[in-house]
Amino acid sequence: MTAAARWRDHSGSAFNQGASTMAWARGLSAALVAACATFLQLTPAAAGPTLDAIRARGLLVCGIHTGVAGFALPDSRGEWQGMDADLCRGVAVAIFNDATKVRFVALSSSTRFTALGSGEVDVLFRTSTQTMLRDVTLGLRHAVTYFYDGHGFMVRNNLGVSKVADMRGATICLIQGTTNEQVTADYFRSISVPFSPVLYERTDQASAALQAGRCDAFGTDASQLAGVRSSMPRPSDWTILEERFSKEPYGAYLRRGDDEWFDLVRWYTYAVIEAEEQGVTRANAEEMRRTSVNPNTRRLLGVTPELGQSLKLDPAWAYNVVRTLGNYGEIYDRHFGPTTPVNLPRGPNRLWTQGGLVYALPLR
């Protein structure tokens, strides 16, 4: 055999061995991928420390507003009513199937994030705007936007003010620790109009100061102005100016470092929205769970168990939430709808299919 023939024989043998090795490796990789996929499908997410602690104590601790109609305000029996209060109750239903297993902690704007970071509360549903600096500097996470708003001003009708530019030299009530402080200062500076801020710790204090004439205007998010006005003795004496000066996307806030708890609160919120998108209501949830052939509806209502398994919740968790509290639109209408004192049109808080900004990511 010549040297060239020996080289051809050797190289061909080596090539065949290498090809066999590569084929074996590819087969092993495919088997590992399939095994991992099967494991992920069959293994529900482990509960994080926050969910474990909530289950151990037997109730959710939820941070809410100190008092503003529409979001969180005690009724005549001392029970908290409002969208944020109901969203807290919904988390309790998702975990315990019991809307009463929640303790509300009323927090001012200046103390809310400290209370969450220290572990005093498990979650904030408290008219809290997502901003870049809050996201990157506080050690907290914004779960998902559930309400879209903007900064506005409310004045007494007889003040003769129709736009913010008319408010030169005005004294303006603001809430300490909110985005509204900076928004107001930035806007008045941009139009070269001087003003005097007066800061208060709570919304009810600022409202009282406005009604007593210690301020010419009250500046905060328009939805909260509508709530404040609805609680005044003579709401018709007050005007909320039409101009809006900021984007104020509200969402639940949670501590960083517990991804499982973040996922639960995030996808719970989307489920409430998804229920409205699919037409599932308090009244028809039971029937739709029993009769719907829509795969998305069956997943949402727990006929098939994968959504509950992935969050380590009962398969019927979202069904229980909607059956107890309603879908997003029902919750909104209960606290802001035309039959309420607040009477705030949905505007950007309509579903995306109706020209709004609200939609759920796919629950699948």
Language-model features, listed with the residues they occupy:
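Bacterial N-terminal signal peptides that target proteins for export
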Residues: 7-8, 15-32
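Bacterial N-terminal signal peptides
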Residues: 29-41
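Sec/Tat signal peptide C-region and signal peptidase I cleavage site
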Residues: 42-47
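Extracytoplasmic small-molecule ligand-binding "clamshell" domains
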Residues: 48-125, 328, 351, 355
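Bilobed "Venus flytrap"/periplasmic-binding protein-like clamshell domains
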Residues: 59-70, 80-95, 129-130, 149-201, ...
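Extended ligand-binding regions for polar small-molecule ligands
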Residues: 86-95, 157-161, 165, 170-171, ...
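Acidic, polar ligand-binding/catalytic clefts
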Residues: 89, 93, 97-166, 223-246, ...
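C-terminal functional modules
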Residues: 310-364
